[in-house]
Design a protein with these regions (language model features):
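Transmembrane helix-loop-helix hairpins at membrane boundaries of multipass inner-membrane proteins
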Residues: 1-6, 14-111, 188, 478, ...
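Predominantly late transmembrane helices and immediately cytosolic-facing juxtamembrane segments
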Residues: 223, 332-356, 409-444
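Structural signature of hydrophobic alpha-helical transmembrane segments
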Residues: 1-11, 74-86, 127-140, 205-218, ...
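Short aromatic-rich membrane-water interface segments that cap or initiate transmembrane helices
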Residues: 62-80, 193-209, 272-277, 404-410
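Interfacial segments of multi-pass membrane proteins
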Residues: 144, 194, 233, 313-323, ...
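Alpha-helical multi-pass transmembrane bundles of energy-transducing inner-membrane proteins
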Residues: 27, 107-113, 117-204, 292-359
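Cytoplasmic/organellar membrane-interface segments at the starts of transmembrane helices
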Residues: 236, 355-359, 364-374, 426-506
Length: 506
């Protein structure tokens, strides 16, 4: 048992406690928070390196093995998601250190708490602790969303809190039904229990599974539970919106993990997602694309791109093949980093335009227009999926993987239009921001510093994912193959206990 597995949770938790104790000094909080984020980078690479060998590491808290104790599980998929969260957190903190973090006393504590919750959700091996980590990251996100105050953020925060409280209640109901029927909430142990479940209890488990899927769909912003996202993400301050770019991926990860590890074990739950996931994914792509066309602010356009990415990812996952899941994982990394970078750039453009902000209206000439324009062009090409950047590679992989699916023509049309139509939106936006005649400059002069470094790091992600597309795609394929071979997961988590017949409720 290696302690490396728990470090992505412990380090940000310790940083959150330290920042809370230092709440009177923003400089001290910055040092602690940035130091923790920097210390996590080698941890991310170590997680990927350890998982790349194909083994599955189990961390049993307190020495209590599953299914009786709390376990963290590190496989290729968990390592990829935790590493992505860690890599995303650093530039978001860099941007916040430019001054946004000083608008509230608890920004860094809440930020680190959310990182801990995200990593815990990716690493946990049972559904109850998935719920716990969901609540940790959601509680932190409630505070982060209201950071900086403002009426729009208060309204967005209220919507966000109400929806997620409803989701949490539904999650608890599902857990109660599953525990009452199966006698366990460990994902590997649940799979073993499903194979022995009496026929009389199968309908109850399917109902609980449907509740779980509804909760995960809310987290992922799958239609019809996606209308909250553009309003909420568009209102958040830039570094918070950047970190929120991975929040929807938690729901997608949960769908992947639970369907592949748990529900795939029994015929009556194996098809729980298949009949409806592809139609809803296509509809989500369409709604996100229309939302981007209708938006009047760059930040809201980027938020709608996240909705589009959710639909694109779930369209691939609906196919449920190894190739499709591998394509989805590659595109997931791309879309998360590029969307986060675009949120930061939109805020930078808004600051440079003064009172005009990032609204699609004539404003003063941009200061640092060349640098902002270069970043805008790079991120626009990446987020639309145009060659030669990683968005094109990811979408091409997904299009290839969905061939032969029942709704393949509709999926192809939706994915291709979600690249073409947003490209027109971004071209129109560029003409407003960079080329339209304007009165004399009234925007602020932007200085190079932490925020610029953050944007450069995230803008560089797409070219790097293109250059290193082969090894990233190979890792994604290996993760997909491991996910579709859950027997190794069961053996690693349960060990000899997999063969023990435990008394269960009838």
């Amino acid at each position: 048992m290696t302690h490396l597995v728990i470090l992505p949770i412990l380090l940000p938790l310790a940083a959150a406690v330290a920042c809370t104790l230092m709440r009177s000094s923003i400089q001290a909080q910055r040092r602690v928070s940035l130091s923790a984020a920097l210390a996590m980078i080698p941890v991310a690479f170590l997680l990927l390196e350890r998982a790349s060998h194909g083994g599955i590491d189990i961390y049993a808290l307190g020495g209590w093995r599953a299914p009786f104790g709390i376990v963290l599980v590190l496989d290729r998929l968990a390592a990829l998601m935790a590493a992505l969260c860690i890599v995303l957190a650093l530039p978001a903190l860099f941007y916040a250190a430019g001054g946004i973090d000083a608008e509230g006393r608890h920004f860094h504590a809440l930020f680190q708490l959310q990182v801990a919750g995200l990593n815990g959700a990716f690493l946990t091996g049972d559904l109850f602790n998935l719920f716990v980590f969901f609540e940790v990251l959601l509680l932190a996100s409630y505070g982060l969303l209201s950071h900086g105050n403002g009426l729009s953020r208060a309204r967005a925060g209220l919507t966000y809190v109400v929806l997620n409280l409803a989701g949490s209640a539904l999650f608890l109901i599902a857990l109660g039904l599953l525990y009452g029927t199966l006698g366990t909430l460990n994902m590997a142990d649940m799979a073993e229990a499903l194979t022995r479940l009496p026929a009389a209890d199968q309908a109850l488990v399917r109902t609980a599974g449907a509740f779980l899927v509804a909760v995960f769909a809310l987290k992922a912003a799958l239609l019809p539970l996606s209308f909250w996202l553009p309003h909420v993400y568009g209102a958040a301050c830039a570094p918070v919106a950047a970190l929120f770019a991975i929040m929807t991926k938690v729901g997608i990860y949960a769908v992947l993990r639970v369907s592949a590890v748990t529900f795939s074990a029994a015929p009556f739950t194996a098809d729980l997602l298949q009949p409806w996931l592809m139609p809803f994914a296509i509809a989500t792509i369409a709604v996100g694309t229309l939302g981007a066309l209708a938006a009047r602010r760059l930040g809201v356009v980027v938020a709608n791109f996240i909705v589009v990415s959710t639909g694109t990812l779930l369209a691939a996952i609906a196919v449920s093949s190894t190739d499709a899941v591998a394509a989805a994982l590659y595109y997931l990394v791309h879309s998360t980093l590029v969307s986060a970078g675009f949120f930061l750039l939109a805020d930078r453009i808004a600051a440079a335009r003064g009172a005009s902000s990032d609204h699609f209206a004539s404003g003063p000439p941009l200061t640092n227009a060349m640098a902002l324009g270069a970043g805008y062009l790079t991120l626009a090409i990446a987020i639309c999926g145009a060659p030669p950047l990683s968005g094109f590679i990811g979408k091409a992989m997904i299009l290839q993987s969905v061939q032969g699916a029942a709704l393949a023509p509709a999926a192809w049309a939706a994915i291709l239009l979600s690249s073409l139509l947003p490209a027109l939106v971004l071209a129109r936006t560029a003409s407003v921001f960079f080329w339209e005649p304007r009165p004399p400059r009234a925007g602020m002069l932007l200085q190079l510093g932490w925020p610029t470094a953050a944007i450069v790091l995230l803008a560089a992600a797409s070219p790097l994912l293109s250059v290193f597309a082969a090894p990233v795609a190979a890792y994604a394929r290996a993760a997909a193959e491991q996910l579709h071979s859950p027997r190794s997961y069961y053996g690693a988590v349960l060990g000899a206990d997999a063969e023990i017949q435990r008394e269960r409720r009838p």
